[in-house]
């Protein structure tokens, strides 16, 4: 059971890391790290799953604030929330029929 929980946590961490790389872009990530972009592609396949498991075993979670913010924005769009008017109540137009 503990192993399954760690595996699930590792998958969550791996997903967060891959999403961050995707949001930033492979080229920008490679430039920031100081490697070629092909190296980042190899890391995605070979190192990130292993590193994610290591982080899960060490109980070092990855907080993904950008993804949480994006999820809130998508939820607001899907629920079609209207923003409050930027005017005073007396300035709003009233129509009576």
Swiss-Prot record:
List, in alphabetical order, the Gene Ontology terms for molecular function in this entry. DNA binding
Which residue intervals are the DNA-binding region?
26-45
The GO annotation for biological process reads: regulation of DNA-templated transcription; viral latency
Pfam families named among the record's database cross-references = Phage_CII
What SUPFAM superfamilies does the record tag this protein with? lambda repressor-like DNA-binding domains
Keywords, comma-separated and alphabetical? Activator, DNA-binding, Early protein, Transcription, Transcription regulation, Viral latency, Viral latency initiation and maintenance
This chain's function reads:
Acts as a transcriptional activator that allows virus to initiate a latent state. Following infection, participates, together with cIII, in activation of the Pe and Pi promoters, which are responsible for the transcription of the cI (repressor) and int (integrase) genes, respectively. Both of these gene products are required for the establishment of latency.
How does the record describe its quaternary structure? Homotetramer. Interacts with cIII; this interaction is essential to stabilize cII that would otherwise be quickly degraded by host protease FtsH.
The miscellaneous annotation reads:
Lambda-imm434 is a hybrid of bacteriophages 434 and lambda. The cII protein coding region is in the lambda portion of the imm434 genome.
Q: Which family does it belong to?
A: Belongs to the lambda phage cII protein family.
Q: What is this protein called?
A: Transcriptional activator II
Biological classification of the source = Viruses, Duplodnaviria, Heunggongvirae, Uroviricota, Caudoviricetes
């Amino acid at each position: 059971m503990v192993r399954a929980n760690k595996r699930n946590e590792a998958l969550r961490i791996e997903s967060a890391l891959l999403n961050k790389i995707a949001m930033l872009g492979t080229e920008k990530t490679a430039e920031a790290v100081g490697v070629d972009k092909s190296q980042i592609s190899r890391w995605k396949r070979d190192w990130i799953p292993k590193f994610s498991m290591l982080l899960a075993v060490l109980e070092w979670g990855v907080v993904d604030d950008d993804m949480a913010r994006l999820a809130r924005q998508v939820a607001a769009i899907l629920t079609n929330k209207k923003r409050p008017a930027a005017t005073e109540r007396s300035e709003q137009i009233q129509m009576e029929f």
